[in-house]
Amino acid sequence: MVATCLQVVGFVTSFVGWIGIIVTTSTNDWVVTCSYTIPTCRKMDELGSKGLWADCVMATGLYHCKPLVDILILPGYVQACRALMIAASVLGLPAILLLLTVLPCIRMGHEPGVAKYRRAQLAGVLLILLALCAIVATIWFPVCAHREITIVSFGYSLYAGWIGAVMCLVGGCVIVCCSGDAQSFGENRFYYSSGSSSPTHAKSAHV
C-alpha cells in the first residue's frame, strides 16, 4: 500500500514539475533587466525582460519584444540553455507516459511485475536527467546574463523552472528509490472476473 501511494505521489509531482519546465521553456520572463541604473529605470518605469527566445521592453502601457532569431550572433550560453531546456521538455513526455503505464490502476495484458518495475525505473532516471538539465540551464542563464546587463530581479519563468526542476527531481527519486521492488509491482495488479450474478474485482495472488 505504501509503495502504491509513493508511485502516485511520484507521478503527480513529476507531472506538475514537467508542466513548470514547459512553461519556463516557452516564456521569456527569465530575468528582469535595466538598461540604465536601477533607480533611473524604476523612476522612468522602464524595465526589460530577457529569456531564451526574445528580449522584451516593458514601459508604461507598452510591451515590445525583439525575437532572438539570429543564431550566429547569439551568445553561447543562450544556445546551450535552449538546448538543455528543450531536452528537458522532450524527455518529460516519455517519462510521464512510462509512469502512466506503471500506475496500479493500469494493466497491460498479463505482463509480469518486473516489466512494470523496469519501466518505472527508466521513467525515474529520465525524470532525474531532465531535472538536472533544467537546473543547469536555469542557474547558468542568469549568471551569464548578469555579465552582459544589469539584472533587477528574477522573472516568473525562472521561478517556475526552479520549482519544476525540483519537483521532477523529487518525483524521479521517489520512483527510483521508494516505490517498491519488482514483487510489489506484481502485487498491485488487478483482474476482472465475471460471475453468475455480478462482476467483481479481486486482487491477484502469487504463490
From Swiss-Prot:
Single GO MF annotation: structural molecule activity
An annotated GO BP: calcium-independent cell-cell adhesion via plasma membrane cell-adhesion molecules
Compartment annotation: Cell junction, Tight junction; Cell membrane
Residue numbers of Phosphoserine PTMs: S193, S194, S197, S198
Cellular component, GO annotation: axon; basal part of cell; bicellular tight junction; lipid droplet; myelin sheath; neurofilament; plasma membrane; tight junction
InterPro entries: Claudin, Claudin11, Claudin_CS, PMP22/EMP/MP20/Claudin
TM regions (residue ranges): 2-22, 83-103, 123-143, 158-178
Main localization category: other
Keywords linked to the UniProt accession: Cell junction, Cell membrane, Membrane, Phosphoprotein, Tight junction, Transmembrane, Transmembrane helix
Xref: Pfam families: PMP22_Claudin
Record flagged with keyword Cell membrane: yes
Task of the protein: Plays a major role in tight junction-specific obliteration of the intercellular space, through calcium-independent cell-adhesion activity.
Name under which the protein is recorded: Claudin-11
